[in-house]
Amino acid sequence: MAAGAGVLGLGLGAFAATKPGDAAKGKDVFDGTCAACHNADSTDPKVGPGLKGVFKKAAMGNKKKATDASVLEIINKGSGGNMPPLADQLTDQEKVDVIAYLKTL
């Protein structure tokens, strides 16, 4: 399955025109938007958890398995802690690209 294709398959109307995720573009978005609070190269926390291997873990800090849908929900709504909702700050394509990048960690 192409990275990001799971998001497309969720029936989320907003993502109907979104292309499969591009991990290289997702890294650029991560570096500009997420890296201030999240480590990509370790599981050590900054303000938020380190995200290395997040899609390989049995569960994230919220006790949910990292899936395209669960990560997209956190990106859009925030985590209820320090993570702000980014639904209006990132385009749908940027979100899919970040998810593709996170899968490479």
Question: What do these predicted regions represent?
Answer:
Residues 36, 45-46, 53-105:
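Extracytoplasmic electron-transfer domains, predominantly the class I c-type cytochrome c fold
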Residues 12-31, 45, 67:
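Electrostatic cytochrome c docking/interface patches
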Residues 26, 31-40, 98:
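The canonical Cys-X-X-Cys-His
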Residues 11-16, 33, 55, 85:
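Residue-level recognition of conserved structural "scaffold" positions that shape functional pockets
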